[in-house]
């Protein structure tokens, strides 16, 4: 990981901190070895060239044109290192009228349409609770790199990969964009509700909420039987998913009337026995301490020479 001398990665200054070390930075950069180089400096360029001569992949996230100014654009690099896979991840990509503008996760969540379908109806603009603009760009970049590595096995040549954070946001809006392109409908926030599947949202119980995702007619029938309202599965307003989606509000009232009789934990146990997709809504502490998460080694202890 190449960082600017003295300044370093901005995220080194983002909290929370443990003994003046950013836990945020460490979570994003675990397993990486950092080096500080000034690519405008001749001696530092020699070090960077030595690194590139042995590298399989170069990943950069400068604004388009920055590395070109320093002599490390793709057109220059591919001549020196023809097997190198060069991946650029930026806010708006290497082409288009916005290519030279800076961007952060929040910017592309807004411009990509994601914030317009997030939150409660008629609420203020709501950011998704994680940096999904950054994360999806990283994932799409990784997919591109893997494809390029596979191609190199056959051709022996490197490849240039251009990933735009904005493009990635557009790519993940599968339902919203389909609705607009097919129906000219502009989707709006619906809280936890799915726009096309029902019941598929959070429902109130006696003590909190439970997620129910009955994604087909058989699962809905199981749910109705469990709630002792088996006749609902044969009601023309709810007998198939299309009908249920048209009558979501009415369906929710009926289901919550029954779900209010027990606590969430009780309903989860009952539904799990019937193999109905469901679950509680955990806070971060509960999610991290979930035995399932622990069994998958998602949270592990790591050694740090200072901390």
Sequence positions of predicted segments:
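Oxidoreductase and adenylate-handling cofactor-binding alpha/beta cores
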Residues: 138-159, 171-183, 224-231
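Glycine-rich beta-alpha junction loops
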Residues: 6, 92-93, 165-170, 207, ...
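Short Gly/Pro-enriched turn/cap motifs at secondary-structure boundaries
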Residues: 25, 190-195, 200-201, 305-307
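Aromatic-enriched alpha-helical interface/lid elements that frame and gate functional surfaces
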Residues: 198-274, 278, 291
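A glycine-rich dinucleotide-binding beta-alpha-beta segment and adjacent secondary-structure elements
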Residues: 273-307
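Short Pro/Gly-enriched beta-strand edge/turn motifs at strand-loop
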Residues: 8-10, 181-187
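N-terminal helix-loop segment corresponding to the beta1-alpha1 unit
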Residues: 1-144, 148-154, 302
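Conserved Rossmann-fold dehydrogenase catalytic segment
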Residues: 94, 122-132, 153-169, 188-195, ...
């Amino acid at each position: 990981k190449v960082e600017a001398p003295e300044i370093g990665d901005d995220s080194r200054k983002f909290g929370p901190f443990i003994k003046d070390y950013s836990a945020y930075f460490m979570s994003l950069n675990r397993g990486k070895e950092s080096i500080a180089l000034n690519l405008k400096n001749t001696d530092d360029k020699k070090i960077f060239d030595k690194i590139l001569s042995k590298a399989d992949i170069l990943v950069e996230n400068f604004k388009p044109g920055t590395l070109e100014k320093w002599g490390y654009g793709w057109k220059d690099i591919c001549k020196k290192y023809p097997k190198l896979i060069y991946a650029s991840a930026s806010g708006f990509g290497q082409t288009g009228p916005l290519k030279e503008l800076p961007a952060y996760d929040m910017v592309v969540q807004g411009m990509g349409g994601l914030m317009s379908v997030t939150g409660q109806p008629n609420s203020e603009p709501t950011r998704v609770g994680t940096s999904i603009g950054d994360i999806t760009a990283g994932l799409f970049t990784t997919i591109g790199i893997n494809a390029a590595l596979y191609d190199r096995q056959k051709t022996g040549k490197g490849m240039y990969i251009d990933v735009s954070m904005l493009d990635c946001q557009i790519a993940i809006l599968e339902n919203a964009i389909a609705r607009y392109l097919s129906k000219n409908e502009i989707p709006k926030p619906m809280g936890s509700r799915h726009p096309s599947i029902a019941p598929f949202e959070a429902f109130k119980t006696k003590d909190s909420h439970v997620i129910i995702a009955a994604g087909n007619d058989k699962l809905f029938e199981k749910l109705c039987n469990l709630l002792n309202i088996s006749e609902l599965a044969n009601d023309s307003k709810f007998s198939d998913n299309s009908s249920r989606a048209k009558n979501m509000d009415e369906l929710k009232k009926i289901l919550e009337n029954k779900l209010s009789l027990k606590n969430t934990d009780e309903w989860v146990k009952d539904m799990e026995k019937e193999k109905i997709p469901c679950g509680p809504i955990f806070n971060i502490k509960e999610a991290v301490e979930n035995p399932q998460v622990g069994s998958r080694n998602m949270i592990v202890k790591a050694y740090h020479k200072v901390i």
